[in-house]
Amino acid sequence: MNNQPCSIVWRRFLTSKVKPAVRIPNENLKANKPTNFTKNFPLNERTKAWERAGEDKESWFKRKYAHVHAKQKSQPQVDLYGKKEAHYSRLKQDILSSKRQQEEHKSKYSRKSVTLGLRPNPLMEYIYGTNSVIAALN
């Protein structure tokens, strides 16, 4: 019986301390030292080719790669399998066929006269006399 109250007191002592949700590793070691960023920088850097040549970057690249564009311009475009030509001919053919379809579609609905669709309305003639729209179009 004496043992039970002692264990309750001991349990309360352990649970009364608020524990942090996240534990930071090596917290005691990092707390006192200042942060040092120099360790993140590279110790030695590779010297660039233009620095070795003693030129600025732009002139070095111009000197090195100037001939590439001239060489590409002098060589004719080579289409070994004729894909480009086939593509352009297919595009031209598609455009012509779409124009032909459009003309066929238009020809179905073309009317010889505008007044063919308008029929005389007897009610309109009774109220207004001759149909004014048909009279104006004729």
Swiss-Prot record:
Gene Ontology MF term list:
methyltransferase activity
Reaction catalysed? Answer: a guanosine in 21S rRNA + S-adenosyl-L-methionine = a 2'-O-methylguanosine in 21S rRNA + S-adenosyl-L-homocysteine + H(+)
Q: Where is this region: Disordered?
A: 92-113
Q: What class of enzyme is it?
A: transferase
A Gene Ontology annotation in the biological process aspect, one of them, is: rRNA processing
Its localization reads: Mitochondrion
What are the entry keywords? Answer: Methyltransferase, Mitochondrion, rRNA processing, S-adenosyl-L-methionine, Transferase, Transit peptide
Q: Main localisation, per the record?
A: mitochondrion
EC code(s) of this entry:
2.1.1.-
Q: Which GO CC annotations does the UniProt entry carry?
A: mitochondrion
Organelle transit peptide: 1-21
Residues in the signal sequence: none
The role this protein plays is:
S-adenosyl-L-methionine-dependent 2'-O-ribose methyltransferase that catalyzes the formation of the 2'-O-methylguanosine corresponding to position 2270 in S.cerevisiae 21S mitochondrial large ribosomal RNA, a universally conserved modification in the peptidyl transferase domain of the 21S rRNA.
Family to which this protein belongs? Belongs to the class IV-like SAM-binding methyltransferase superfamily. RNA methyltransferase TrmH family.
The name this protein carries in UniProt is rRNA methyltransferase 1, mitochondrial
